C-alpha cells in the first residue's frame, strides 16, 4: 500500500526574518504481496536570527600600588590621573584594553534525506538498502565598532569590589588623535554527510541465521563564506579620537569618543571617509573530509534449545 505525510511549520524569530519555514515529508510504498517496499523521508529547515554583543579584551589582573608610578602605568593610568574610589594597596584590580560593541546576523539551512528499499523474496530472506544525506549550511555576518585604550587614562572610577576592583568609568585624553576600529566579518561553513548501507538477513534453516552488512560513509566540512573561505575579516580604523571614555556600569557597556581630525585627518572637524584608513584583512580556511567503510559477516547456530554458537568477522577502514 501507499502512505504519505507532509508537515509544514513556520517559526517567528523577531531577531531575524520574521518567519522562517520548516518542511518535512514521508512517503512509503509496498507491493500487494508485501515483498518489496520503498520509503523516502526528507526535511528542510531554515533559520534566521540576530544578536547583539559586547566584548572586553585582556581581562588582565594587576596588583594596586598607589605609591608606585610604574604600577599605575602598568594599568594604563597616568601619574596625575583622577582616581575615584581607589582600591586598597595590594588589592587585585583588572585592566581593560578595549571595548567592542557589535551585532551578528545569522542564517542556517539544514537538509536531511533518507531513502530505504527492502526486498523479501520469501519469509527466510530480507535484503535492505538505504542511502542517507544531510547538509548543514551556516552563514553569519558581524559588524563590531570599538575603542582601544592608549595607556593614558586620566580619569578612572572603580566599583569598590573588595576581591577584584573593576573600573566603572575609564576615560583618557589623547593628544593628536588615535585610532578606533570597525571590524567586519563574513563567516560561513558547509557540512555534508553521505552514507550508503546494504544488509542481508537470511534464516538458512531453523538452526542457522546469517547476517551480512556493508556500509560506506563520507563526511565533508569546509568554508561557505566569501571565495569559499570560512572567515573573511576586514578591519578599518579612524585615527581621529581626541578623547574617549567607556562606562562599564551599564547593562551593556557604553563607549563614546570625540573627534579630533586636526593632525591625522582632513581637519574639517567632521568624521568622514577621508578620516578612515584600511587595516588588516584576513582570510581563514579549514577543510576536512572523513571516510569510513565497514563490512561485517556474522551468524548464529542453534546447537540445541539451550546452546547457541555465534560466529563472525568484521572490517573497518577509516580515513581523514
Residue ranges and their predicted role:
Residues 1-80, 105-111, 124-125, 207-208:
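Outer-membrane beta-barrel translocator/receptor signature
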Residues 2-6, 91-94, 276:
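Surface-exposed beta-strand-to-loop junctions
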Residues 9-10, 19-30, 45, 96-142, ...:
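Outer-membrane beta-barrel transmembrane strands
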Residues 14, 184, 240-252, 283-287:
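Generic amphipathic alpha-helical segments used as scaffolds and interaction surfaces in large
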Residues 46-82, 134-170, 218-267, 318-320:
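A surface-exposed, glycine/aromatic-enriched loop/edge motif typical of exported proteins
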Residues 81-92, 174, 267-274:
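Acidic, glycine-anchored loop motifs typical of Ca2+
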Residues 85-88, 162-178, 278:
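A broad structural signal for short, well-ordered beta-strand segments within beta-sheet-rich domains
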Amino acid at each position: 500500500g501507499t502512505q504519505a505525510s507532509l508537515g509544514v511549520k513556520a517559526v517567528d524569530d523577531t531577531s531575524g526574518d520574521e518567519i522562517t519555514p520548516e518542511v518535512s515529508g514521508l512517503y512509503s510504498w509496498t507491493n500487494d504481496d508485501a515483498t518489496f517496499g520503498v520509503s523516502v523521508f526528507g526535511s528542510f529547515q531554515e533559520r534566521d536570527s540576530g544578536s547583539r554583543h559586547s566584548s572586553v579584551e585582556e581581562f588582565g589582573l594587576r596588583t594596586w600600588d598607589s605609591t608606585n608610578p610604574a604600577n599605575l602605568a602598568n594599568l594604563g593610568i597616568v601619574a596625575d590621573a583622577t582616581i575615584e574610589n581607589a582600591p586598597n594597596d595590594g588589592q587585585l584590580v583588572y585592566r581593560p584594553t578595549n571595548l567592542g560593541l557589535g551585532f551578528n546576523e545569522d542564517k542556517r539551512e539544514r537538509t536531511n534525506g533518507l531513502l530505504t528499499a527492502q526486498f523479501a523474496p520469501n519469509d527466510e530472506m530480507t535484503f535492505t538498502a538505504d542511502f542517507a544525506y544531510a547538509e548543514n549550511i551556516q552563514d553569519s555576518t558581524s559588524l563590531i565598532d570599538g575603542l582601544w585604550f592608549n595607556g593614558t587614562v586620566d580619569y578612572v572610577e572603580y566599583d569598590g569590589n573588595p576581591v577584584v576592583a573593576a573600573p566603572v568609568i575609564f576615560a583618557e585624553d589623547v593628544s593628536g588623535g588615535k585610532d578606533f576600529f570597525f571590524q567586519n566579518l563574513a563567516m560561513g561553513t558547509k557540512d555534508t554527510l553521505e552514507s550508503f548501507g546494504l544488509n542481508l538477513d537470511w534464516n538458512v534453516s531453523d538452526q542457522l541465521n546469517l547476517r551480512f552488512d556493508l556500509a560506506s560513509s563520507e563526511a565533508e566540512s569546509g568554508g561557505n563564506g566569501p571565495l569559499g573561505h570560512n572567515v573573511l575579516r576586514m578591519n578599518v580604523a579612524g585615527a581621529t579620537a581626541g578623547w574617549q571614555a567607556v562606562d562599564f556600569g551599564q547593562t551593556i557597556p557604553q563607549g563614546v569618543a570625540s573627534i579630533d581630525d586636526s593632525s591625522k585627518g582632513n581637519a574639517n572637524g567632521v568624521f568622514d571617509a577621508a578620516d578612515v584608513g584600511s587595516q588588516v584583512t584576513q582570510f581563514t580556511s579549514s577543510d576536512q573530509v572523513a571516510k569510513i567503510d565497514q563490512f561485517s559477516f556474522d551468524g548464529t547456530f542453534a546447537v540445541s534449545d539451550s546452546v547457541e554458537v555465534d560466529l563472525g568477522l568484521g572490517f573497518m577502514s577509516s580515513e581523514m
